[in-house]
Amino acid sequence: LMMPVFIHDFGINGLWMSVFHSISAFCNAGFDILGSQDCLYPSLTGYSNNYIINIIIMFLIIAGGIGFFTWDDIYTHKFHIKRYRMQSKIILTTTALLIILPAVLFFLCNFKELPFGKRLILSLFQSVTPRTAGFNTADISSMTDSSQAVMILLMFIGGSPSSTAGGIKTTTFAVLLLNAFATFRSQEDVCAFGRRFDCQAIKNAATITMMYFILFFTGGIAISIYEGLPLSSCLYEAASAVCTVGLTLGITPKLHILSRFILILLMYLGRVGGDRKSTR
């Protein structure tokens, strides 16, 4: 579907470029080969006005990020959502919320000078891509501090179990959130969709989250101290590394060798985690 656009822009090479970016999006890699356009690292900013490219890339990112077991439920049960595994229900619900709510915030806080349509598609894309995809269609460094903070949270959460995405996973985030709600309401059991989470699942979720938080925060502070850069920017780069996203505020190429080594280490450690069953 992207071939006509890329062939129009790059000739016969557009065939290869459409295949490359499709795989990169579905696998949540975020690599692009468009650096010969306007600058060295444009990502998909040159296609921010192209709704076809935006929608297809977003669909592929989401498709690769919800997990293969979820797709198995969708394929097997179609629209009979009640028959889905509880994990699939949690994944689909959490994914929808993590796309819609941040997109609303981005729409309200950014791109105010743009027409409604472009503003909407930019907001949606920047809401989808932090979940370990790594593409961008806007200058992230020009977005508001609150938007960048939300993007850090989205990167931290990442995709879903059995998917191509990183982060602590949507199910882990959902378990912690449901546990907090249950605590506030003085409920002993943590439940979702009529089923109960066991204590070990909650412990696993807390452990995984704390491990990622320690790596992310320690790495960000270390880079900030060594480079003398603002902590917020360094935390953004650290979150992008440990959650294997690939987004940047533009400071990574300027970092010294030690800071780059820290980011490399965070990338490797970020892939060590527990894609463990969290429900019963």
For each feature predicted by the language model, list its residue ranges:
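Membrane-proximal intracellular helices of multi-pass ion channels
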Residues: 1-280
